[in-house]
């Protein structure tokens, strides 16, 4: 199932991801997260990325998630990733990027 994205802005900026995040489904156009990066969002705002409705996930999904986190850091957003499936968490753990799922731009972490 191809991924789809829903963006909510109240009470906080929230990206709900649904579908599979794997080599078969992740495309370059998904880097824009359903138009999220075109929105005018103030630095310091919080972004929640909810992965509770994704199916399969592999390293392509992890790469996409890390891209989104890097984009959020560039815009100085505080990010939180919710409902990370164990398959994705395991890949993040062995890649030593699991701590990127909760980020604070003031912490000095380079994404």
Question: What is the predicted function of each stretch?
Answer:
Residues 1-60, 67-111:
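STAS-like cytosolic regulatory interaction modules
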């Amino acid at each position: 199932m191809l991924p789809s994205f829903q963006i909510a802005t109240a009470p906080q900026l929230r990206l709900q991801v649904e579908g599979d995040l794997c080599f078969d489904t992740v495309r370059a156009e998904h880097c824009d997260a359903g138009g999220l990066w075109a929105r005018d969002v103030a630095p310091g705002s919080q972004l929640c990325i909810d992965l509770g409705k994704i199916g399969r996930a592999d390293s392509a999904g992890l790469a996409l998630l890390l891209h989104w986190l890097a984009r959020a850091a560039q815009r100085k957003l505080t990010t939180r990733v919710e409902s990370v499936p164990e398959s994705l968490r395991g890949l993040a753990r062995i890649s030593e990027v699991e701590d990127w799922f909760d980020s604070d731009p003031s912490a000095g972490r380079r994404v």
